[in-house]
Amino acid sequence: MAKSAEVKLAIFGRAGVGKSALVVRFLTKRFIWEYDPTLESTYRHQATIDDEVVTMEILDTAGQEDTIQREGHMRWGEGFVLVYDITDRGSFEEVLPLKNILDEIKKPKNVTLILVGNKADLDHSRQVSTEEGEKLATELACAFYECSACTGEGNITEIFYELCREVRRRRMVQGKTRRRSSTTHVKQAINKMLTKISS
């Protein structure tokens, strides 16, 4: 059997936005009512995405990490889900600063991420409009989803699958760039040698 591709995904957002519930809904198709929001967990999950077996390592961050922990998680991850709660404007306002930290830690690479507005079942308490989420996603140059980990509303599976696809696309582009770059170096070295020989 062919070896599966491995992808490291990390979930970030303020404590209480439903990061753990989102991950558990994706993995088990169930909603958990009680859990410790201060716990950090890592899950391994295998899925077939576009006819290819992919092993996801998913880091569910606690949302209360200190700076050193958070930066370590950001270095570890290849793809990121930035989650906010549509009923909590403060959690939405924390997304852009999080993205800026990610950019700083990951540079010069572009960050692969998806923006998620969770708790879409609580539309009556909404503080962040869908349009605001879409506008921020455009600024961040990423896909945007609204969903509910509680009811399963929105395509939660697609969030994780699309992030895996995007990570794998970026890997392929970076691999081609590296190959082109090394080919250029070889050509330059040969040209230098030929110049020396002919002079």
From Swiss-Prot:
The record, for PANTHER family, names: RAS-LIKE FAMILY MEMBER 11 (PTHR45704)
User: Any keyword Nucleotide-binding?
Assistant: yes
Which of this chain's residues are annotated to bind GTP? 13-20, 60-64, 118-121
- Lineage of producing organism: Eukaryota, Metazoa, Chordata, Craniata, Vertebrata
Looking up SMART domains in the UniProt record yields: RAB, RAS, RHO
User: Where is the protein situated, by its record's location annotation?
Assistant: Cytoplasm
Q: Which reaction does it catalyse?
A: GTP + H2O = GDP + phosphate + H(+)
CC annotations in GO: cytosol; fibrillar center; nucleoplasm; plasma membrane
- EC numbers listed for it are 3.6.5.2
Family to which this protein belongs = Belongs to the small GTPase superfamily. Ras family.
Role noted for this protein:
Binds GDP/GTP and possesses intrinsic GTPase activity. Has higher affinity for GDP than for GTP.
One biological process GO term for this chain?
response to hormone
- Keyword list, A-Z: Cytoplasm, GTP-binding, Hydrolase, Nucleotide-binding, Proto-oncogene
The keyword Heme is annotated on this UniProt entry: no
Q: Which Gene3D superfamilies match?
A: P-loop containing nucleotide triphosphate hydrolases (3.40.50.300)
Protein name stated in the entry: Ras-related and estrogen-regulated growth inhibitor
| Single GO MF annotation | GTP binding
Name its species: Bos taurus
> Cross-referenced SUPFAM superfamilies, in alphabetical order?
P-loop containing nucleoside triphosphate hydrolases
